[in-house]
């Protein structure tokens, strides 16, 4: 018996599984049975050259398999059908597709298959045809033959190439041989030439003619070439390329400095603090280090790569291609974006960490490193915020000197657009963190430190020099005179005003600040401001006459110590008015917050009044306003972008008035609106307060607390026309009680039958213990105390913030002088009414007709508050920005008409009338002080017949008069000229005449110095003149006239003088060392970092270099637009501009006390002594000609 064929069944099953998953062709087919002519439907799967079939698609084991190697497949016609069965079934069978698989040898029965669709049948036949290993071998053999043929061709080409290379090398060798032969032949000819010359003597005239011809040809070629070069040098293209190259060189220098700053930040602060955080007793943890220095190290690595790329480009000069470098920088901007978003949080974390004394001590050690050059950590953290705007300015300048068809132009424009997007975010963050950095800088200047400045909610308002008048017992002023030199020297104080505190410091010779041991830090919540101190009994004329009405008094009533008084003198009436306005507004904000918290019952931990929190318009972004995360002095989010309407609405919001918003608005309103529009808004608020205030604001103004709802007296308003108004609120005094209950000391001239409430004007009181009243009020005023009566007396001993209510008051009691207590039920005053009266009429007596009904009248409250707001804004506007009214007579007349309309109100309170009269007096007075003296006035006063000469004038006289002239020119610049970059426009002389005069004066003084040096013919006289002018510059430095220092040093650095090596060799070493010191002080390196530090450490008066501030303003203007794409005002930018203008005006407002010397001034202003630049250089070449090359 023949045995059956054995095969590997397990492997066959594995192949069947692969066929089911990865088969070439799979699907149902009908297979004809071998026994009977019956068709059975099976599921077939073709894998390589093996055909499996299964009982169904889900069957795991195959029913059989066919080996297709060496077989063929062809289509067969449908078999004949019997007539049995329905006709439809026969038609269906005829339409099916039949094909047969034939095996290679005889005797093997073919495999007959069929499928329902013709397309599927063709695909099966094609797949079976290709399932042959023999066919694949044949195709492989054909490909191998082709490959071998190609390899042979390549080898042949290589051989041919080598042959050609050898031929070329042989030819090169032959060429070198022929060249050497030619050289040898030429040398042979040269040796043989003398014999031919001897034989044929040339005519001497011919020799001369040839020499002249050769000379003429050379001269003509050189002249032609010089003309070509000169024409190109003077061409616009060459000028543009020079400027472009200069921009690139400046950019490389700035990038080098920036990388060095980042290196100091990382290696001088970040890495040492990481090590300190890993110590046993860490002064700071790793999380805080990461929060402060987020991405700083990565930014340093990025810019080191960028800097190396710039230096590599310079190596290929004059070909400068920069666009690809910016293409490298742009993808890394997301690193900068993270740094920008973290910037404000970084400075807040740093301020909190500085409260740890160990960390503060360690940080001071790091900052004492000579590499830091006296700069603080927050300064280094801010440098990356200014770098992207600097790139934008550079790209602007590059594009201005790049032709439109230049290959780099599109790339540079794309880089600029991408950087501008990030720059807008950076400017917003820099604006938001300006206040934190300013506070930290002042805190670091104070030797003893000042913890209150580490509070990030403190907002810097103003600083300046004031004179503190010494006082004796009983609050009487010492008998001192304003002109006393000892008073100025010993009593000069550097004062800083913040939203919550007032700092009084003395400055040491090194520039550092020292807080006064007594009264150095004044909490404004404990202060009462007295604008016009009354004279004592011994001095009937009063201190106002003694000090020229420049003094004001701050009465401090600390809760745990005896009260004391600080008397300060301002340098001018305008300065006094500005200080008074800002201090009273800061006190006002604090008192308003405190009163609102008492009136509107809140949780003791909540400092923001409920009615402000519930107004979404004050903190929620909308289509016409966008807020930042930073809060202003009234605990309301600062405005980032807003429409003009929303800014005017914030200015006239009767619930609060932020002093920092008001100062920014008054500094920059000219950019986005006009003075006429602002005044019209104030006039509308006064005349039509109900139609000018948004409805939602009115609703929230009268909103009452949930737990203390009192009903207003039912009745109509007595009249709809304006009858009542109030002047700007001033400070109220706070007293402490033995039982530590919260009290507000208030004085009022109310009718004795009514227990109403009012606040006394502190400007009308002479001391904190005495109370005065308006002259119109004949009866003595009644003292009232508004007392919070808690249900639980145990809560009285809790430690409370000055601005918070200690507990929920159940009712208000009015304490009359006789000791009787009247319950508040006698006058049903709503919390909103009580607050409005207390704040709107702060410090003023009540009118005779003030009664219970008017107290509860909403219209009455709104009118009083609206009048208060109008007078408050006008007081700030007139006292701080008098130039607005001096230069715009129409605006001045409109304000006068509005104030006269207020004065015509028959029911105006005496104190309101006094406040209005003060504003009118400030507008109408003609101040003849020399603070308004102009350069033209001095020129007219110095018409002397004979001017002094340089030799007869001392260095001190020259320095003093230069300082006087520089400060007069500097302070004459109106602040509106700093807006809009007018000094860079084509019509700059019309838009910014005073800035252009300042620039012209700077150039004329510098030209005078250079001209006077060049006027001397002998070397010794020129050297002596240089030494004298350096001495003048050093005296200017002592006088804080850094503009004068730069005038002289720039003159000495002119090429006409700098090139005089023989003259400089005669100058002493001490003078040269002093010259280097002065140049370092006023150097432009690092955005004038040395000059900024010097100005920060000196007291006014001073004359800074104006170009430094103009650069800052141009930097801000170029970095971000004034308006967004939606047409909103970029108020963050306005805030940054306001900070710079505030610093400029700080130096403008403090005048020098230097007497004019007409002869010296006439010498300094004599234009006949000035030599122009070209003549100076020609004179310099005559004095010391160029050395032959």
UniProtKB/Swiss-Prot annotation:
Pfam name, any one: RasGEF
Originating organism: Mus musculus
InterPro entries given in the database record: DBL_dom_sf, DH_dom, PH-like_dom_sf, PH_domain, Ras-like_GEF, Ras-like_Gua-exchang_fac_N, Ras_G-nucl-exch_fac_CS, Ras_GEF_dom_sf
Loss of function: phenotype: Mice do not display overt phenotype.
DH domain span: 243-429
Compositional bias per record (Low complexity), positions renumbered to this chain: 762-776
Spans annotated as Responsible of the affinity for farnesylated versus geranylgeranylated Ras: 1051-1080
Comment field on protein domains: The Ras-GEF domain and the N-terminal Ras-GEF domain form a Ras-binding site and mediate Ras activation.
Expression across tissues: Expressed in brain in the nucleus of the solitary tract. Not observed in the hippocampus (at protein level).
Cell compartments where the protein resides: Cytoplasm; Cell membrane; Endoplasmic reticulum membrane
N-terminal Ras-GEF domain mapped to chain residues: 635-755
Positions of the PH domain: 22-133, 470-588
IQ domain segment(s): 205-234
GO molecular function, one term: guanyl-nucleotide exchange factor activity
UniProt domain Ras-GEF: residue ranges: 954-1186
Modification note: Phosphorylated by CDK5; down-regulates RASGRF2-mediated RAC1 activation.
Region span, Regulates proteasomal degradation: 743-751
The protein's name: Ras-specific guanine nucleotide-releasing factor 2
GO cellular component: endoplasmic reticulum membrane; glutamatergic synapse; plasma membrane; postsynapse
GO BP terms in the entry: long-term synaptic potentiation; postsynaptic modulation of chemical synaptic transmission; response to endoplasmic reticulum stress; small GTPase-mediated signal transduction
